[in-house]
Amino acid sequence: VSSRPAMMGFYDATRSKQRTLSEESQKVMKQLSGPMTITTYVNIFDKEFDVASPKEQKEDMARFKMYTRFKPEIKMEYVYYYSTPKDSALYRQYPNKNIREIAYEVAKKKNFNPQKLKSAEELKEKIDLAKENYRFVRVVERGSGEQARLRLFDDMEYHPSETEISAALKKMLVTPVKVGAITGHQERSTTKKGDQDYSLFATHGRFRYSMINQGFDLVELNLKDMNDIPSNINILLIAEMRSSMSSKEQEIIDRFLERGGNMMIMGDVGRQEVMNPLLRKVGLKLLPGI
């Protein structure tokens, strides 16, 4: 009897094979040749520290058991670090102490060896954790260098499901679909978190169904600064323009559509004059009141 994936046998006795990866995910795993490492970065100040603390590592590793079944050479590593905003309440809670000293105090309270902690600055050459808001994140890396990220989500399920994990792994095999979000006309932002913006479905790392967590890449494009849309853009996202495009910008979009590009358009009430010149190109128009 062994607990090492390479030495284990598996048999799924469930009627619907719910303890086994789907056929599509199995195909992805077969293509991922060579070594693979999943590195989990955990902030000592993060409320999710206990998800992958040293005493919880075995349980955490078990979350990937369906994947190690098909690729037993997967290695899992854990990096513990510290970082917090300069206006954090921790500075009031621990007066006259710097961030490192506070981290050591918190580590001791959590029965964690503070000597194992690194600062986010020390890790910056390998990963910019600021882009993850210093929250829990995993980096999946192949021996050939390709990388993908896995995050926890602010919902009831919390952990990524097979859908999100396989979507991340697939990004290391094929060029992900790239979405270009048009800017420059007071469109709804795909990065800001305001009520009127679209970051939740586009780039929010903690939202399970955001584009970046479902296998897409997204970049912003200002057509005023361009002569053509890059060839690696597959989809254009135009999110409720408030000012009209120039003839040059219209021509750029026309060429994109002629080469077979796709477009996702959202238009708000009362924007017919702004949106219809663009929509006419594809045989559509917004009617009054729509």
Residue positions per predicted region:
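Short, surface-exposed patches at the edges or C-terminal ends of soluble domains, predominantly
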Residues: 1-290
